[in-house]
Amino acid sequence: MSPKPPSDSATEMVQVVLPNDANPLGFILGGSVMHLVDIAGAIAAHRHTRSLVVTAAVDELQFLHPIKVGDLIILKARVTCTFQTSLETQVDVYSEETLTGEKKLTSRAFLTFVAVTEDGQRLRVPPLLVETEEERQVQAAARVRREERLKRRATPRA
């Protein structure tokens, strides 16, 4: 399987925040953002694997700033690291004020997807071809998140 660069899976989604996705204060619902984050991450994972993917984990999702009705919500996703049958994606969410064009980072999430066949069997994923120092740092951070996630899974809960 040939390695693929992160640029092969880079994904950008844009849509207008409408009232049906907002709370009474006129800001997009956190659940609506989470739904879009999952879709953007899955598209990036699918582009990298060229297979079906399922969401296995959301390691981190931060809401830094609200997005108001009428603004654009922009989601940028990319694969950060690959493992045997899974991969991590990073999804950055931005708001864009439609009249001024001002953009602001509003959320960031890290999701793990597993590549599967139509009958749910795991598939090996192509390695990620990291070419820049920034990509190496992002990949190293993803490996740390994975180790932490696996430790949490192995710890019995009360």
Language-model-detected regions and their locations in the chain:
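Residue-level recognition of specific faces of alpha-helices
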Residues: 14, 33, 57-60
